[in-house]
């Protein structure tokens, strides 16, 4: 290079981290891509590189501040000093998030310039530069983040290039040696890891995505890197449905009410601004009321529960049900939940049940807790009459769950590792979801349950284990199948892959027999043909679909980087066939003879031998399988408005969502009376009206899916000019949304503090009705209808929970009685995370959280 050449122009010493527009306006830039100011003013967000050239977010790797740790992905350390150069490659997946740079594949020196183009601002391999100069240290760290030094002499630049070329060659050699041993597993795993979550509010991501939806490049939005980036705080699955641009107006209205964006950005009409301010006040007031309601719900049981349960100390904490109440509730449990999840052996339970009422002090901890949990679970579907009675039942049942959790948490008692202890664990997890005691965080409790099951050898075929009787072998097979299904259900809700693979156990399916056909003295078990319905038929049908559902969860939340539509269609077709198989249980023939069981309980019928499947059992089985359909299609269903190819996914998701919240009516195959069939259907309705966990997830998935289908259909008709010509399908969707509004109202009255579901559904109806009246976004009438629907809903929900807070006073901890050990009958502890949630943002409606912590 000519030494007489004039020196290059001087560059800025400090890297220009703000975007060009913020520097021009002399305002603070949040350094996001795009930044909030550019989003608000609808201007292109452009960042200027150090060389003075202008690069947009689609073709430049931006330099950003990062952690001081040298092990951060994307940071290259220069040898011999503490200096470093760190670049953060831009994401080609839209504005959903950036991915950590993947390890480069092995290649020769001739392919090295492909790392960056010749005109790239950060191109360190410019062919016009000499690479033969000796290595010289010219890189200096920056207190605000890694940046290039101001030393730009030709010899220094050549030294930088030579040094980096040598280091790249060393890294490629190391990568080649690893790839030769592990194949392409390293590259595939690294490429699927997303960028660590930015330390900024979650609502900012949502508002930015929807405000810039019109400027997104064509193609699929919301890529896998974005899902991984947000997984650490988004504990539910249905938030991906919230990425649909059809919800942009509703989310913007909610953001303004929460004070996240300016009212002027939404509307300049004073009346609308006043309603927005009122809505924000109602949201805050409702949150405060919900916090007061939770004061009477301790998150941990008393220390005195370490004693034998029937002791007088425990009586201060647990309200033991009456014999008459316990008989009814336990019978309801065995007729409903025990069909799909075989946890208990009915004759054994009823024998222990009778012994307990004869001598309560002689009952073991496990038996006592089993009875309490069975009664609590059964009472969840009982007709209590009114909302106050439902709330009373919830307050009576939750202490039983706390008692079981405390007993299971003792790490020094080996009886927790017995079959009875595992049965208590399964019942406790089921009750937690039904009564919403940390039901949205049940995945974290499935790990200990699975590990305990592995420790006692439930994953091994009991026929190959020495000393295991036929009776115990059958109980172990049933319990293992139940635990596996609980694991896959919890994984679906937590956006997590299954905790184990299907090739890590060799347990055979349970036998198709009734409980009354085996006991401790049984030496030979002759199963019924699969065409005969027994008390195990529902679990066997559920178990047949387990490999498919495991595969769906692994496909959705595994480490692969992308989803292909043909694979989704294939899994969807197989899942539809599995649902058809489950529904065929209603056509199974009855047994040759009634296997009724007499357990000295008078007229109480406690048999588990059903002649045909009941409506509740059919609905529960269908629910546990069908709920996998919507998340499978969810990613593509959100794209159906812009890409008609994916309209099938929206249709399938809509059908599944409607089925989840619409229990099947009794059929002619059941032999019970019509009144009994109707009561069975009402049982499942009551479960959806009160339960949390996987049942609340189904409700949330249904409301987002059905609402999306309604908005997409209405907007399509508005564009095509058929909004007033073909209203039949739109009216049916509106009727479905109104049914969801009624269900959301029942949930609020029955103790749920999530008022945003009710508000969201009414806002959807208000938006569609405004479109039918000819209103369009920006004309004032559209915004007025949206805000009015939201405020009206918030007023109603505020009044409901306020009345509940006034009539159900919280516990006065200062007046609690203390026992001889100085411990209160129960301690307040921390609020359970299920009470308020992790984020007070709009996406908490679309995930598993319902309120934010104060």
UniProtKB/Swiss-Prot annotation:
It comes from the Eukaryota. GO terms for molecular function: DNA-binding transcription activator activity, RNA polymerase II-specific; RNA polymerase II cis-regulatory region sequence-specific DNA binding; zinc ion binding. Residues 19-45 bind DNA. GO terms for cellular component: nucleus. Xenovulene A is a natural product exhibiting little structural resemblance with classical benzodiazepines yet is able to displace high-affinity ligand binding to the benzodiazepine site of the gamma-aminobutyrate A (GABAA) receptor and could be potentially used as an anti-depressant with reduced addictive properties. SUPFAM superfamilies: Zn2/Cys6 DNA-binding domain. Keywords: DNA-binding, Metal-binding, Nucleus, Transcription, Transcription regulation, Zinc. GO terms for biological process: DNA-templated transcription. Its main location: nucleus. Residues 56-156 are annotated as: Disordered. Disulfide bonds: none annotated. InterPro entries: Fungal_TF_Env_Response, Transcription_factor_dom_fun, Zn2-C6_fun-type_DNA-bd_sf, Zn2Cys6_DnaBD. Pfam families: Fungal_trans, Zn_clus. Induction: Expression is significantly up-regulated under xenovulene A producing condition. Residues 146-156 have a biased composition (Low complexity). Residues 78-90, 125-145 have a biased composition (Polar residues). Transcription factor; part of the gene cluster that mediates the biosynthesis of xenovulene A, an unusual meroterpenoid that has potent inhibitory effects on the human gamma-aminobutyrate A (GABAA) benzodiazepine receptor. This is Transcription factor asR3. It comes from Sarocladium schorii (Acremonium strictum (strain IMI 501407)). The lineage of its organism: Eukaryota, Fungi, Dikarya, Ascomycota, Pezizomycotina.
